[in-house]
Amino acid sequence: MANIVLEIPEELSGLVSAVQALVDVVKTEVDRARTGGAVDYAAFERRIAEKSAEVEKVGHQIALSALAVSAPQVMINKVLHHRVLAETETRFMSLAGAVAVKRSLYRPSGQRNGPVVDPVALRAGAVDGVWLPATAREMAFEVQQRTSREAEASGKRLGRLPYSHASFEHVAHTVGERYVGQHRQIEQALIEVFEVPEGAKSVSVSLDRVSVPMEEPRSRPPGRPAQGAPKRPIERVYRMAYCGTVTLHDEHGESLYTIRYGTMAAGDPAGLCEGMAGDVVELLAKRPDLKVMLLCDGAPEMWNLLDAEFTKEPFGAAGKVVARLIDFWHVIEKLGAAARVIAAETEVKPLLASWKMRLCNTSSARLAILEQLHESGKEDVLVGHDKPVHEAITYFTNNAERMDYAAARRQKLPIGSGNVEATGKTLFNVRMKRSGSRWKSRTGEHIVHLRALALSDRWDAAMDRALKSPRVVIRVAA
């Protein structure tokens, strides 16, 4: 059988042996297959992946070397730099593994202790000087999904990102730090280019809290520390973090798309609400016909935070926020507990079903149910340490103006805050409440923000902006 000649430019000659090794692996497998013997295709998959990775690494080596300069003096963005280290080898980290590249290092002229510049890393947009941008992006994506040790194991199994758990941890938080530092600007840019789904008719804004295990310093007991006592005693405590959603709904109140937000307990919930309000303003600029509603549980803190933003312009205008609702299922939960006190066991379900029906179809139902709770005369009945009827009365009294579910249904608006409830579970519980896990505020904030991007289908667009390489012009100085 005749061979096909592949011409490779001399400057890319390093690829020849790697490509030949890949061809040889495939040819060997083809020859073995034609003999009709036993085939271990899984082993072939691994071999071809290894050889393909070698081709990839050689390609990176050649391309990165082309970014290098080695002149004694260069102009970098019109600033004179002199060489401080010539033709020294370093390793850049790619998706396929480490790549050795020779490069020179430079320092601004006249600055004895000025920052050292690596032209290759600068031009390639390497994160932290050695991690190639796509590699850093994917490592951060892995760590927002799972622990760094699981990411390490996955990388080794797949033959991609073959790095240690410490490297995954370091790179993910480096990317997280870079994103968090500019997240407001990036979120603004993302919402400006967002295309509102054609079928969107309303937008709901929700806010909730979720507990997160935190690592905090523990006070030492008085007296001299016991032998073997930890030098830095800590304790694992739960603090309440915040999550929010902006959800677009169709003509039936069903969710079309949700933007998810989060911040740690020591974060900035007011800033989170400001960001959500800003996104809704942009959505209204694109679609002024969208109906805006606020939807969350009955916690006063949540409503105070939302109202601080959604009573300002443009939301202060009459009719701009068409509904403010307590989550329907939180209300039913309160009523269910009260019904078990008021009614006989066989009447609990019919009574609760009646209340549900009335709330969904009659605007005055909330007042009628409140009166029924009062008339039961069982406000002081204890169930364990709770007074279910008293709690339901208090809930209805404090939130009656946020329970007009019948009016919301007539406008085809949602009445349940399931989107933010689900966000609390997927954003925090799934990733941050693993057995034995504990978090610090700064690094936890990195993961929360990165995970919110991934869950909102905004990862690539956000990383394009967060890891965007600065424009670099390098010229050899005369």
Give residue ranges: language-model regions.
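Catalytic center-proximal scaffold of phosphoryl-transfer enzymes
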Residues: 1-65, 105-478
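An N-terminal low-complexity regulatory-tail signal and nearby short nucleic-acid-interaction modules
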Residues: 65-128
